[in-house]
Amino acid sequence: MGPRGAPLLVVVLVLGLHALAEGEKPSPCRCSRMTPSNRKNCGFPGITSDQCFNLGCCFDSSVAGVPWCFHPLPNQASEQCVMEVSARENCGYPGISPEDCASRHCCFSNLIFEVPWCFFPQSVDDCHY
């Protein structure tokens, strides 16, 4: 392999590792708590549930007119904290620290502005594929 082949090999290895990392089946809460109207397509027409899960995506064919294979909600430290931002119920105050939020036994995520950063957890009993 010549000097021009080495960068290509690096790209192939990086893409392969990225594919392996993304091929993990998401948790049930990351899928079932996604509102159908907010689903972002992650597959192709006719994709099977196994193919979809192998892409690291969610699959639900029970709702017509929306993607059946879709990107999951973001991962959280606890399954109880996985939810759409519209479902967050405030558990703190503006500017609360992650430590103060945790002392209230609540979830913390400051990635999105103008929504509660400290919010009550939800039961995982309703999570399913």
UniProtKB/Swiss-Prot annotation:
Residue ranges of every copy of the P-type domain listed in the record: 29-73, 79-122
S-S bridge residues: 29-127, 31-58, 42-57, 52-69, 81-107, 91-106, 101-118
Keywords carried by this UniProt record: Disulfide bond, Growth factor, Repeat, Secreted, Signal
Locations listed in the record: Secreted
Any single Gene Ontology cellular-component annotation: extracellular space
Organ and tissue specificity: Expressed in the digestive tract, where it was found predominantly in the stomach with highest expression in the antrum. It is secreted predominantly from antral mucous cells into the lumen of the gastrointestinal tract.
Main location: secreted
Source organism, top-level taxon: Eukaryota
GO terms of biological process kind: calcium-mediated signaling; cell population proliferation; chemokine-mediated signaling pathway; establishment of localization in cell; gastric acid secretion; macrophage activation; maintenance of gastrointestinal epithelium; negative regulation of gastric acid secretion
Gene Ontology molecular function: CXCR4 chemokine receptor binding; growth factor activity; structural molecule activity
Classification via InterPro entries: P_trefoil_chordata, P_trefoil_CS, P_trefoil_dom, P_trefoil_dom_sf
Signal peptide: 1-23
Job of this protein: Inhibits gastrointestinal motility and gastric acid secretion. Could function as a structural component of gastric mucus, possibly by stabilizing glycoproteins in the mucus gel through interactions with carbohydrate side chains.
PANTHER family linked to this entry: INTESTINAL TREFOIL FACTOR-RELATED, TREFOIL FACTOR 2
Name this polypeptide is given: Trefoil factor 2
Organism listed in the record: Rattus norvegicus
